[in-house]
Amino acid sequence: MTREMTGAEMVIQALADQGVKHLFGYPGGAVLPIYDALFAQKDVKHILVRHEQGAAHAAEGYARSTGKVGCLLVTSGPGATNAVTGLTDALMDSIPLVCITGQVPTHLIGNDAFQEADTVGITRPCTKHNYLVKRIEDLPRILHEAFHIASTGRPGPVVVDIPKDVQFAKGLYSKPKDFPHIGYQPKVKGDLDKIKAAVELMASAKKPMFYTGGGVVNSGKHASELLRELVKLTGFPITSTLMGLGAYPAADPQWMGMLGMHGTLESNMAMHDCDVMICIGARFDDRITGRIDAFSPGSKKIHVDIDPSSINKNVHVDIPIVGDCAHVLEDMVRLWRTGAKQADKKALGDWWKQIDKWRDRKSLAYRQSNEVIKPQYAIQRLFELTKDQDTYITTEVGQHQMWAAQFYGFQEPNRWMTSGGLGTMGYGLPASVGVQLAHPKSLVIDIAGEASVQMTMQELSTAVQYRLPIKVFILNNGYMGMVRQWQELLHGSRYSESYSEALPDFVKLAEAMHAVGILCEKPGDLDHAIKDMIDIDRPVLFDCVVDPAENCFPMIPSGRAHNEMILGDAADSLDSAITEEGKMLV
């Protein structure tokens, strides 16, 4: 069934038909017809952000915590360009977004009109796909196609750029079922022969290792359930990338902790020494592999990924399997069960003994203090006091992000929202706005740094406006901590522009925005202050003043292999451990 509508009305109707409940945006001249159509309906609730980057990150948080497509609406020119950072972030981390942008009228495109920008050209490298809609007849198909592309295959952001005259034009609107999307149908079922070969290789392993990533989370909760079943069936150890945290429970004894530059010693050493690596939904990025030519040199590698371009891109693998993680894991579980497969118990037992020796090194250990709050301790206490609640965590980017990954134990998928690939400072606060809207009864905490959070601090006002009781837990060390750490370790402690000399009073800043501010400076006061934060049913800025000199360990020096990892007690040797080539990789 078709109905005549304006282009602006089609946009809102398409969002409603796609199940969109919340739309993050900021109005401007080139999208006023869409905002007028928005005013006339009640199906889609608009959330007015303070900056278009905030709209993109809020949509990311919404999408990552629900598995649904996140949506944003921005005007032409600076509205679209302000959203580019968030779009790039979503592309790097495989987050499904649909971004509707306004554009100058079609007859003015290319004339340097007011607030004109080549949105399609600018966003081509940072989107999964983008469109410039020149005809009203194409608009319904493109809108529905955008959701299909964003949410299938490897998820990602899609931009639909709509000139203002197309928004005013009238045409016939059709619902999603009228468009079969025959042009884009990514492969979800893995090749069965390759899956059989993978299972046979797994059964022959002496020192196996599961290496999982954000693709498991993106595949849905069933994928996480199947992963847990397969890990239990095999008895193999498992690690994860930053983006994959929560797909496997951190409390389980087979969990090795996070992998990579700031991962645990046991996970990195096991990856280096394993003989069979089962990579599921990860992409072998540089923060995971360390030096490529020394990455897990003795292992046969199985790689499961829905994106064929990710396979053999960075690391050559022996058994490539293109398919959705849930579908492939289902086949793996079935074949392991029906084939009555069993790992070599003696070899696996010896492997676990070696892993326990690495665990005994306690690579995440740090020196406690009764005088100053250690950032690791702050995260540990935050975890202990919130783990029994319905909690979602977002982060900014920096040392605090790594400490959160190391010390906050995630038991379920979709509970951890962070900027992994792009490393976007300012991601966490607006992302928490999106998460809180999606989960209004849940406890949503942004673990932040005092430098990073200032990138998008204005979005606290958004939380206040919509009565979203987000908690911003700031680890305040007075520095851009990760920058300071690298300057200390690589540049002779020459702290060039990494000290935040004019920090705001976060308590007063919170109060100025009609939120609540809390200051905590002593370890003995921390538990009580965190409990107060949790109990307050309003947005809270929690200024947790931590040790300014604390560094984030363990770490793999840039350009080094996994078995060259340095623990905190060996930090003095780090400068000599990093090669000149490695310094370029920081």
List the model feature ranges, each with a label:
Residues 8-20, 61-67, 91, 149-154, ...:
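Glycine-rich phosphate/diphosphate-binding loops that line cofactor/substrate pockets in enzymes
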